[in-house]
Regions:
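Extended intrinsically disordered or low-complexity regions, especially N/C-terminal cytosolic tails and loops
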Residues: 1-105, 151-158, 162, 178-238
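Short, contiguous, well-structured surface segments enriched in hydrophobic/aromatic residues
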Residues: 68-83, 101-140
């Protein structure tokens, strides 16, 4: 297990803070674009705000690691017991892993719920009323329902989907047919070997994927076909 350092966590926190700032700008822009609609309900706005919340919570987790969990003084003041350096490292690594998996799950859930809602509004008959498996949903939405296909978007979501599915098995990839899989995204091949742990899902990877998800989501909700829907798209998950 790689030792966590305050410097490493601080760098990750700065990266995520920069993305949060971009997310602030995204949310303001989408609220302005759909100014006549209720921002807490309309699915085009909540598509951004749900991700905004996820990124914010994950940034807080990194700040907690940086400011508190990796500092012995916090343990003395709050836990009221002596903790060895190895104990602090072990618990901090466990918290980091837990927070990273929550980041993946929440990002995936936000995208999935938003894409299903948007597809139903664009075509209520597509993908069994938006209830088919998620790969069918995002391929249909991105490839055939928008005015322009967002470059590399299906590869990005294939990658996120397979990573998220591996989270269900504590980071080990399994598929019902026993087959391996691979995704090529931005020129890099990510391999998923059946029955083996995936070894590339660190914080840097998660933050990079999340930032690209952020850009994709804004691209989708700004698409002219989505903008042409002149009624409220109710998000029951908001």
């Amino acid at each position: 297990m790689k030792q966590l350092t305050i410097q490493d966590i601080q760098k990750l926190g700065h990266r995520l803070a920069t993305i949060r700032h971009s997310m602030d700008e995204d949310l303001d822009a989408i609220k302005a674009l759909y100014a006549g609609l209720e921002p807490r309900i309309d699915a085009r706005i909540t598509a951004i705000s749900k991700l905004h919340g996820t990124f914010g919570m994950s940034h807080l987790c990194l700040m907690f690691l940086h400011k508190d969990l990796l500092n012995r003084s916090w343990w003395v003041t709050n836990i009221k017991q002596r903790a060895s350096e190895s104990d602090i490292q072990s618990l901090a690594c466990s918290f980091s892993s837990y927070s990273r998996m929550a980041f993946i799950q929440s990002t995936f859930s936000s995208v999935e719920s938003s894409f299903r809602l948007l597809l139903r509004e664009l075509d209520s008959s597509a993908c069994n009323g938006g209830t088919s498996d998620f790969k069918s949903i995002y391929e249909c939405l991105l490839k055939s329902k928008l005015s322009q296909y967002p470059t590399d978007s299906v590869d990005l979501l294939d990658l996120l989907r397979l990573v998220r599915n591996s989270v269900h098995n504590n980071g080990v990839y399994f598929y019902r047919t026993g087959q391996d899989d691979a995704v090529t995204w931005k020129g890099h091949i990510y391999n998923f070997k059946h029955g083996f742990p995936i070894d590339f899902v660190n914080w840097d990877f998660c933050i990079t994927v999340a930032d690209n998800i952020r850009m994709l989501m804004r691209n989708v909700v700004e698409d002219s076909n989505i903008r042409a829907i002149d009624r409220l798209i109710i998000d029951p998950f908001s």
